[in-house]
Amino acid sequence: MSNTKVSGCIGLLALILALPVSAGKPIDNDGDGYNANLDCNDNNSLVWEVNSCGVCEVEPLGGCNASNPHSDLNWADYPTACISCHDGGIAGTQYEEMFGSTHYQWTGDTPDMVNQGGTLQGKLTNAVNSYCINIEGDWPVCGSCHAGRGVKPGEGDSKANVDCLMCHNKDYALNRVRKPDGSMGPSDGTAQATLDSYVQNIAAPSRTNCLKCHAYAGGGDGVKRGDISSALMGNSDMHFDVHMNVAGANLECQDCHKFESHRVIGKGSDLRPTDDIVRGAEVTCSSGTCHQGMDSGSGHAASGRRGEPDRHVARVACQSCHIPTYAKDLGDPSHVPTEMNRDWRFHHDGTPADGVSGAGHPHTDKLANQTPEFKFWNRKSDNYLLYDLGVIDPLTGRYPTSRPMGDVNDGKLTPFKYKTATQPMTVADERMIALDTFEYIKGSGDAITAIESGLVNMGYPVNEPYKWIETDTYQAINHGVNPASDVAACSQCHEETLDLTTDSKLDAMGYRLKGPKEQVCAQCHDGSKNLPRTWDRMHNHINKGTTGIGCNFCHDIERVERNLCDPCDSSCAAEYVDNIAYPHQCN
């Protein structure tokens, strides 16, 4: 509403307050159906009201019913009534904020991407993954979780396409479907009273609102994330998730994923845009009033807990110890497994995707109670984009669609879901094909037809040669935190005894010795002493002598935060090296 209209409203309100109060309902002078109160525009054609409360009240957010200012709205008012107040009107600029957010645009700036980081990226356009591959050709299905009313962003949409109720009424969110005309909204046949209740009962987003989409990402409940499923809507098991359970903390998603101006912090390693560039993408466990000081290096011991975690927090993410498994199955029938492999050559029942048996979902392998893979992550990712040249990862033998960046000296050890897929790629230029998932899932069900449609959508000829390849992805695990009494055992990373003849889990992460055992150990030992066979005894080297022996005496890693002796520092190294010096590379 313009300032002129608001001023007119306030002036009219002052006049109304000066008039004597008469019994009975006011006359509906403008015939708009609102007569519970004197309407803003009953005697002023230059302004309008959105409900019988009137939009020109001195305290607009209170309305005539302070507990529910939307109580007199009806379904026909949606979204016009919302826009009149929330698009630069008396209630704020929420439409403008939401319209520009990643939740609506599905693309955004990508400061955390090493692959074409200066470009706009997102699921609306160029994102490719090992699930539904790419959205090209499949807006009717993939777009059903878009925060809009049906129109694809950039194709004639406007702020009126923003679907407020998707996040602000959980009953509406559960009943929201793709309608025959392509729009999104309540299913046909929904009772008028139910429709009216959607616009009359507006609330902050609940877990149900968020999970209606996020739990079903990738094509089904719990399919994509491994740590997010519909079970979190009403979970009461602390061991399933200590934060999101109705018998415990009962946190809402936005308690951690803080929103400002409809932009949110926090995203997975495989997601490209950063919604709020100023605040960044990371949710920290010790922010605000939660777990204060636990990342300080002394917080665990100070709180009366074990002290070992304190020496890990600088290099190990909280999730690595506090989420020992994902896709949990604790005997509750609502808990669901997660997808670990997908093969587009076959339908879900194992039959060939040749169109004979009709449309259907691709074949998937789903598992529960999975142990994460661990990688060092520095918050940067290399995520495949449409038309990128595919390059095999020599460590896995597969084409990656998402890789967390970092190494033993750069980043924190973080738990990941590792997942594979079989999907098509062009032969000549080795680019992953955006198989037309709508053709596959809702059309013929023929993989060849879906590939040909995808090729055409990408600008290739329909007969462009293709091949089947294996892809893989890493996805950070962040939800499903266990109670503090049930953290991962040290053996999840540290084997019970040392075996220097083969690579351990930690060796594979960069902790292997920097040279042959005999040469590394000979710096300090003459061979007469047996090698410690346990991790804790080996770790005691950092407590030796005046300063402690630095990690890079034996490994190609540095832990400067511990202030240990560096082998290149002659002022302290002589205290430890008393046998055969190792040829360390010193600057």
Name each model feature, range by range.
Residues M1-I10:
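Bacterial N-terminal signal peptides that target proteins for export
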Residues A18-P20:
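N-terminal signal peptide c-region/cleavage motif recognized by signal peptidases
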Residues G24-G62:
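Extracellular calcium-associated, cysteine-rich motifs in secreted modular proteins
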Residues V55-S206, K212-S286, Q292-P309, T414-T420, ...:
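Sequence context of c-type cytochrome heme-c attachment sites
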Residues A281, S286, C290-S402:
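Repeat-solenoid scaffold signature
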Residues A368-K412, A421, A428-Y460:
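Soluble extramembrane regions of membrane proteins in the secretory/endomembrane system
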